Amino acid sequence: MKKLFGTDGVRGVANVYPMTTEMAMQIGRAAAHIFRNGKSRHRIVIGKDTRLSGYMIENALVAGICSMGVDVLQVGPLPTPGIANITSSMRADAGVVISASHNPFQDNGIKFFCRDGFKLPDEMELRIEELIFSGDMDSMRPIANEVGKAYRIDDAAGRFVVFLKSTFPKDMDLSGLKIVLDCANGAAYKVAPAVFEELGAEVIAIGVKPNGTNINAGCGSLHPEVISAAVKEHGADLGIALDGDADRVIFVDEFGNEVNGDNIMAICATDMLQKGTLNKQTLVATVMSNMGLDIAVKRAGGRVIKTAVGDRYVVEEMQKGGYNLGGEQSGHMIFLDHNTTGDGILSALQVLAVMQRQGKRLSELAEVMFALPQVLVNVRVAEKRDVMTIPAVAGLIGDIEAKVKDEGRILIRYSGTEPLLRIMLEGQDKYQISGWAKEIADLVEKNIGGSKVG
């Protein structure tokens, strides 16, 4: 059982355990020791988003890593997939991302990439934790002339821009397209506008003035209403919203209607099926994806495999099965032919390429999938008990499942990063499933304590 690492690294409120400078230094020390194999000089890339606490945590990590004889390459604010890409392209031993993704600025996190750009497997996270809590690290310190050095890589953002543009078809450009782009005042505030503008689009950029405390604040992928209003105001062709570390993306079409991760997976999967480029005719999604996605892909001659929630589990399944497209309803999209992790900007480029190639507007492309009505209720809880051990809750869920049968489904799971129980229902009648979701939430509140969120 891991004590620090969750589904997406170590995460919490900045300056509160475990996101303290003391723990960040220990994480840096332990990771550096584990990645330090052989006698050659070793290097770890560190990047971050735009949170105020990023400076504090970065300095602690740098100190910890250097104290164990490993050099640090600091790339500054850069999207999470950019850090994965730079780690691999610079042949570093590992990459570290300081970010809490879509969470508010008060939170922060630390997650690692291996030298190949893929996220750290569970067993390596466990090794880092074991070393931290073993108390053995003081005896592992190198002597003074063997400590590491820290360097700044000033052209990291430019390198990533060049890489992203290389994933767009060379015989196409974006001239004639007007795009509203929301960078969430986060890590992509410089990179994303540059990519789309250099490919010829007219870009109306918002969320590009980070101040340390406004990341994800009323903007970004969790607030599609912002780009929806801007698309209507400017008569744009579409809107693109990234989150704080730009590993996910949400769209709105020319009418301001949201096009979520399921829609995007359906668009890309069916296009790749038509071209014969979808490996094994298979898309990898999570259990949160709408049943309408399964129907759309099956109709096009493919299939959908479902994993647990979390882009790391999607990537693991893709690697294991040799698949090249996967993603989540939340907007994480993984194109393994191009990158090793969820990449909002790269995903947007692939969708734009489909639009240009097929000569269709986004609203037309989105018609490939019709989503079943879906309701999601979050309940904030004090403890993460197995709700199926509560007779009243288990009984109610069983009754609802019997009524839904094959025309819908119930999914109940705890968030991997927050103290939330997520209750999701799909079915033919939205009003009916909304009532059922509320019934389950009320029973959970009564038996575990807590309150509904959103």
From Swiss-Prot:
GO terms for cellular component: cytosol. Coiled coil: none annotated. Gene3D superfamilies: Alpha-D-Glucose-1,6-Bisphosphate, subunit A, domain 3 (3.40.120.10), Alpha-D-phosphohexomutase, C-terminal domain (3.30.310.50). Mg(2+) binds at S101, D243, D245, D247. GO terms for molecular function: magnesium ion binding; phosphoglucosamine mutase activity; phosphomannomutase activity. It is an enzyme of class 5 (isomerase). Activated by phosphorylation. The keyword Magnesium applies. Catalyzes the conversion of glucosamine-6-phosphate to glucosamine-1-phosphate. Belongs to the phosphohexose mutase family. HAMAP family: GlmM_B (MF_01554_B). This is Phosphoglucosamine mutase.
